[in-house]
């Protein structure tokens, strides 16, 4: 169940990263939002954009690493899984807050954001205790 969730989560993450950044690739959109001389300029948008790139790159790399740890039955898997789950729980509202301070007119707390937070909370409430307490987890993830 965990392995299936990791793979589906990774594919969903790749899709959402592609959807998020596609409008900025090979277009003048980023320039129009970061050029001080244009009326579409948004102060600090470039910083927000780079932060989004870094966080999303981190998430993609960590998700791929988690899949590797899972299939190699590494002892590190439960700890990294818990770390990433907690990171996502903190990153979603933090990202929304930072975006709302940079773009005050943007509606950052929307249906999708609330859904993501509740999905992460629900997933964390189930899988974090399982990773910490399960004898099966301790017996499966034994490789160094």
Predicted segments, located by residue:
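Topology signature of small-to-medium multi-pass alpha-helical membrane proteins
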Residues: 2-144
């Amino acid at each position: 169940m965990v392995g299936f969730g990791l793979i589906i989560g990774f594919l969903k993450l790749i899709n959402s990263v592609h959807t998020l950044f596609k409008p900025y690739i090979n277009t003048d959109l980023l320039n129009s939002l970061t050029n001080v001389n244009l009326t579409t300029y948004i102060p600090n948008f470039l910083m927000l954009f780079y932060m989004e790139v870094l966080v999303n790159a981190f998430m993609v790399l960590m998700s791929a690493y988690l899949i590797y740890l899972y299939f190699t039955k590494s002892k590190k898997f439960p700890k990294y899984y818990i770390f990433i789950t907690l990171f996502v729980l903190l990153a979603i509202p933090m990202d929304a807050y930072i975006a709302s301070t940079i773009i005050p007119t943007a509606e950052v707390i929307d249906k999708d954001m609330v859904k993501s937070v509740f999905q992460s909370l629900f997933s964390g409430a189930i899988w974090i205790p399982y990773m910490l307490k399960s004898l099966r987890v301790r017996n499966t993830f034994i490789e160094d």
